[in-house]
Amino acid sequence: TPFGLFAPAMEYMVDAAQRSVLFWDVMRQRGNQYREHLAKTVPHVLDYKAELVVDGRTLERPVNYLLVRVTPPAGVEINPKLRPFVIVDPRAGHGPGIGGFKADSEIGVAMKAGHPCYFVGFLPDPVPEQTIEDIARAEAIFIEKVTAAHPQASGKPCVIGNCQAGWAIMMLAALRPELFGPIIVAGSPLSYWAGVHGKYPMRYSGGLLGGSWLTALAGDLGHGKFDGAWLVQNFENQNPANTLWTKQYNLYSKIDTEAPRYLGFEKWWGGHVNLNAEEIQFIVDELFIGNNLAAGRIHTSDGTTLDLRNIRSPIVVFCSKGDNVTPPQQALDWVLDLYENVDDIRACGQTIVYTIHESIGHLGIFVSGGVAKKEHGEFSSNIDLIDTLPPGLYEAIFENKTGDTANPDLAGGNWVMRCEARTLDDIRALGGNDLADERRFATAARVSEINLSLYRTFMQPMVRALVNAPVADWMRQIHPLRLQYEVFSDQNPAMASVAALAEQVRENRKSPASDNPLVAMQEKFSDQIVAALDGWRQASETLSERMFLAIYGSPTLQAAVGVDPDATQRLRKAPKNPLHRELLQKRIAELKSRIPTGGLRAAIIRGLIYAGMNRAAVDERGFEMARRIREAHGDMPIADFKALVREQFYILLIDQEAALAAIPSMLPPDKETREKGYDLIKQVLGARGELSADDNKRMSEVARLFGLEGGGTRTHLREVPKKPQAKAS
């Protein structure tokens, strides 16, 4: 009937009018929140109380960075013997705090696991003339302070670097490797040219804009400061459907419940910060366009070369196929730039663990509660396992704990983590650049250098003469991203009546029926808008890629800027170090001399490594069993245990036959002690379930070496004390 059609329409119109009022009231709240947030001395979005430890502005080379100690919330107990965690937030246009944005965050899961937590944040404006190197030196002081504050800790601090902070931490670890425990880099680009055709076009933007001269121009227009709002806008441009429609529509369609989450995120997203012009110029020239980090082409002010092969701490790389800002290739291809094979990685004493999420976006890597509880939670709980892994390349795999999981009490949480051995071919299989692509990006880098020189010679003096501090400040205030907050705040008289009207709407709120046909039509209309914007994005990305490949693939242009069009080698390959080879040979000779030494403890570790060699994976249950055994037999410090595991691994790698032959001479004469040692190996190896035929074969060989042809006795898992857990509410 006509009335039957009219009723849903009226219901929908009333709801739409009410939603519109509530939507604009949230926009008003967002604008007010933006102004209040920026008025603070240290604006941040940390969900925790914290106490200042070091103010970077007081250092010899002052910077705008701060180190704070995070206060654990009620109900969370910190174990002083556990290594501290240091979370470093990205300074990429937004303010600090996203690493501790909520309870299910990197900080939250680390404290829940019992670790003391520190946070490295920053102020909105840089100290005049501060550089990237100054920040690195300040962060070194921060880590020294953290280490000194925890003399009882089982290991050096675990440092987490999100996005931009990841490559900054890697640079510092290359300069000061002795400071670090395990390093976790989340969504951090380290190989800036890497990618595959048809995806991730952000890497082409530097070449299509003619290089970094625009960066220099932006710094000059800011009177020596670079407005971080431009970086935020660059992020938003990667997903126009979300920027122009989905984010706002999601709020509108869920207006009765979505406002707190929306405002919480917008508080961080709109907290724009500035960088010095010199800082952003370094980042663009040396990293994003030059791709010089992994190639070892960056030098400090005193001439020291930044070589990522100097890093001695385990490196955990967390990336995602759904991340269009830092795709897996940009997060991992630095390994290909540095090494020829896994033996090269081992020769440098490096342990590299990576995990690739199938779908999460860039921000989700360090914002998503689900990711925090799963990946970051497992990393926090198993950080000592990662720290003890023998050198090599591994992929972290997470399996859901079920009723069929063997020895579930040995794995904390809802997941079981194992680290599976990988080769460089596994990284190559993700796809990447060929030599033609390498030449294109090298050409773009040379064009950038030329254009930057031209700008500095002919335009920069004029721009600097025209722009003073008040003009630069005015231009920052009228940036479109800032205006969208300012315009819809209470500063705008037109918004004065919105709050009162919204209160009336809440008192008389009427939602439509769930089966209202117009609501379903609205959803379909929204889907069509998203599809249209996604189509526009895909078309523009395809055009961008084709333009870049055509322009910088020109042999004429390549030759003109000094790039050999017929080059047959990668243009950003890190050089070999002859001194490293010499030191390696000395280390091998030293290890060979230690083959018959170490006694019972070394023999047990050697036998365990040999017995599990063919598994190509290390399971957290096996490590937890080893930890319980270690505590039950004198609690060998984790640093000593790590050194022993690495030494025995290298000894087996160098000369397995001699290493095994030496085991009988390392054991005591009494059979009972040898049986106990053998049973410890069997417990650790059996922690993940039944032994395979190969496991049993190797265990028989170990039994023979231990003088136990019958295979030793059986010690039950329950006889070993369980790991003490930190309490959490």
Residue ranges and their predicted role:
Residues I311, V317-C319, D323:
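Short beta-strand/loop motif that positions the catalytic acidic residue
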Residues T1-G4, L123, F288, N292-L306, ...:
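Alpha/beta-hydrolase-fold serine-hydrolase catalytic core, especially in secreted/extracellular enzymes
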Residues V159-G161, A186, F318:
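Short beta-strand immediately N-terminal to the catalytic nucleophile in serine-hydrolase-like folds
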Residues D564-S729:
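Small-residue-enriched hydrophobic alpha-helices in membranes
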Residues I160-I169:
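Gly/Ala-rich beta-loop-alpha elbow adjacent to hydrolase catalytic centers
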Residues A39-P126:
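Short, surface-exposed "cap/lid" segments of acyl-processing enzymes
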Residues T1-V26, A148, Q152, I169-E278, ...:
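Alpha/beta-hydrolase-fold enzymes
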Residues Q130-A148:
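Alpha/beta-hydrolase active-site loop
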